[in-house]
Amino acid sequence: MNRLQVELPGLSLKNPIIPASGCFGFGREYAQFYDLSVLGSIMIKATTEQPRYGNPTPRVAETPGGMLNAIGLQNPGLDKVMNSELPWLEQFDLPIIANVAGSQAEDYVAVAKEISKAPNVHALELNISCPNVKTGGIAFGTNPEIAADLTKRVKEVSEVPVYVKLSPNVANIVEIAKAIENAGADGLTMINTLLGMRLDLKTAKPILANRTGGLSGPAIKPVAIRMVHEVSQAVNIPIIGMGGIETAEDVIEFFYAGASAVAVGTANFIDPFVCPTIIEELPALLDELGFDHISECQGRSWKQTCHSR
């Protein structure tokens, strides 16, 4: 029995560990360190219809317990992803999750329609929560009606299940999650980064050229856990949880909150081996906690019954 195997819409994962979009590129750099086939999946870099060069520099700043980024969805564009990046990834035994972004609803629809045809793309991650672009991005993820409409339009053209990435920069994340579920989403991924800022002590000006950026890393984990805990009790579609995950213990905490799989982001910048290390350590942790299978941990913090030994 594979104690870590997870079945989600469109995704048969050998384990629930997935590098998060934006922190792993298209996997080329990390393939120098280990066989990417050990992973559950990869959420590839956000793809837009046309190439994007991103925001001006500086666009990364360290913070206590994390980092701020304002990359601005830099990517080579749909054609390059379809003709180069995705074919390269076919050498690995991996179902790919393609992150889809855009400035207008029509952009999302166009990218989703084409990229979902790729043979190794098994699901889409609809990026309606990037805080670092002036148009699109978070604008779609902070209004329930707009988020639902975009979800419905993408579902109509996608050939694979659609997961929607939620923003934490909202007053009521449950309301948005339920609207997206009602629009036909197959799953949710959460959370994206929290909007933040750092100021230079000598100039009193923002360190980032974009002024603000998305906060990620261990500092946001308690927020992510709280939001997964709330949303998982309100919807009937699976959640891929993310936000500050660095260890096997972090993974179990997200499962307890209600996640069915997890994505590891900023930690990849600190330790390129973090994902395989977590995968290796999870079975021993399950033994220690008295579980036969990782699915037994899902929603344990709020479910009335559990199946621990």
From Swiss-Prot:
Family matches, as CDD domains: DHOD_1B_like (cd04740)
Any GO CC annotation of this UniProt entry: cytoplasm
Enzyme Commission number, as recorded: 1.3.1.14
Catalyzed reactions: (S)-dihydroorotate + NAD(+) = orotate + NADH + H(+)
GO molecular function: dihydroorotate dehydrogenase (NAD+) activity; dihydroorotate dehydrogenase activity
Stretches of the chain forming a coiled coil according to its record: none
A Pfam family of this chain: DHO_dh
Pathway, per record: Pyrimidine metabolism; UMP biosynthesis via de novo pathway; orotate from (S)-dihydroorotate (NAD(+) route): step 1/1
Main EC class the enzyme belongs to: oxidoreductase
GO biological process, one term: 'de novo' UMP biosynthetic process
Protein task: Catalyzes the conversion of dihydroorotate to orotate with NAD(+) as electron acceptor.
HAMAP family (alphabetical): DHO_dh_type1
Family note: Belongs to the dihydroorotate dehydrogenase family. Type 1 subfamily.
Name of the protein in question: Dihydroorotate dehydrogenase B (NAD(+)), catalytic subunit
Species per Swiss-Prot/TrEMBL record: Bacillus cereus (strain ATCC 14579 / DSM 31 / CCUG 7414 / JCM 2152 / NBRC 15305 / NCIMB 9373 / NCTC 2599 / NRRL B-3711)
